[in-house]
Amino acid sequence: NSFRIELDCDIYITGSNAKLLSGELATVLGGRYVEFTIYPFSFAEFLELYRTVEPVASDAAAFQQYLTLGGMPYLANLRYAPEPCRQYLHDIYNSVVLNDVVRRNKIRDVDLLARIVAYVIGNIGTTFASTSIAKFLKSEHRTVAPETVLNYIKYCTEAYLFYQVNREDLQGKQILATN
């Protein structure tokens, strides 16, 4: 508060974890902050910036690039060059998984987490259940409880690595039965 009294300024706290403003920090700031969740670019936003780097690229080529690299704004600074972009995205992934997920949640089996993350990323847009992942891992001689799978997915969601999309085709008690 002394900064705001002595200086006419705004203070920004950034982070890649939903728990950042939970607990003590939220209590200290109580009512004096506004939270903004910022997502990667939509395709329309990506296209606008991509056109500054590749002005003659077709919409189809731009969309393919968007599907391949995603919508992280900094990629434009790398001129969408494949190798630097892949390295940048790999570094973000390692930072989020290792710092925000493994350390914050004290995960001991990092290999299991990496396998679950790879599965979820490889199955974007498809419906799956934690029990089916646990059964598959059991067939690979890795015993894991469905609750552990759910917890790992929850931790990744809290770190903004995943975004859960709720099913819209369920009604009534079917919603309660879905995991």
Name each region found by the language model.
Residues 60-88:
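Conserved AAA+ ATPase small/helical "lid" subdomain
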Residues 17-21, 41-44, 169:
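Conserved nucleotide-binding/hydrolysis micro-motifs of P-loop NTPases
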Residues 10-16, 37:
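Structural recognition of the conserved hydrophobic beta-strand(s) that form the central parallel beta-sheet
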Residues 38-58:
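Conserved small helical "lid"/interfacial subdomain of P-loop NTPases
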Residues 1-12:
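Conserved Walker B catalytic segment
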Residues 19-35, 47-52:
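Short regulatory helix/loop adjacent to the ATP-binding pocket of P-loop NTPases
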Residues 80-179:
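Accessory nucleic acid-recognition modules appended to NTPase machines
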